[in-house]
Design a protein with these regions (language model features):
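Substrate-binding pocket helix/loop in short-chain dehydrogenase/reductase
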Residues: 15-16, 23-28, 110, 121
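Active-site helix of classical SDR
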Residues: 39, 75, 83
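Alpha-helical segment proximal to the catalytic Tyr-Lys
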Residues: 44, 88-89, 149
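Residue(s) in the substrate-gating loop at a strand-loop-helix junction
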Residues: 59
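Short, small/polar-rich loop/turn modules that mediate ligand/substrate recognition or access, typified
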Residues: 91, 96, 151-153
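A conserved structural motif in NAD(P)-dependent oxidoreductases
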Residues: 125-136
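Conserved small/polar residues in nucleotide/adenosyl-binding loops
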Residues: 169-174
Length: 174
């Protein structure tokens, strides 16, 4: 395996004071431990061959946090820590490790959002739309290519300029 893409992600949203240990643990197990379990088996071969590309799909919410997503944001921030550490460990062995932090992308996860919530999100994306999966795929393809051989420990933020916009909820969730 020359290129590995770790793309684990589930949501179990709840405000922190209502979050259950089960919600916390399920998200940690999938989003963080899943990344470890995806990369760890192929890492020795990359080291032996002195070549490898590790790409982790994190999230805008791992960069900025998000109301009701303490568990998800923690895992996606943890993914960035994994990338930065692996970049340092792998650099002398020809291995790069980078992340892509998508904003809201037209996936099943986003399609399951209530319509009003999605409208509010789109209203806060300066590009005026959610991203498309192929836009993230092109970021991954670039990071896997020879054109990115000196890019290591970096993050591509693909979010339509949404980076530090906060979504405010007006429900009784708080």
């Amino acid at each position: 395996v020359d290129v590995v893409v770790a793309n684990a992600g589930i949501l179990r949203d709840a405000p922190f004071h209502r979050m259950t240990p089960e919600q916390w643990n399920e998200v940690i197990a999938t989003n963080l431990t899943g990344v470890f379990n995806t990369i760890h088996p192929v890492w020795p071969g990359m080291r032996e061959r002195k070549f490898g590309r590790v790409i982790v799909i994190s999230s805008i919410n791992g960069q900025k946090g998000q109301f009701g997503q303490v568990n998800y944001a923690a895992t996606k921030a943890g993914d960035l820590g994994i990338v930065k550490s692996l970049a340092q460990e792998g650099a002398r062995n020809g291995i790069t490790a980078n992340a892509v932090c998508p904003g809201y992308i037209a996936t099943e996860m986003i399609a399951s959002m209530p319509e009003k919530a999605l409208e509010a999100v789109i209203g806060q994306i300066p590009a005026g739309r959610v991203g498309e999966p192929d836009e993230i795929a092109r970021c991954v393809a670039f990071l896997a290519s020879d054109d990115a051989e000196f890019i290591n420990g970096s993050t591509i933020s693909a979010n339509g300029a949404q980076f530090f916009v906060c979504l405010l909820y007006t429900s009784d969730a708080a």
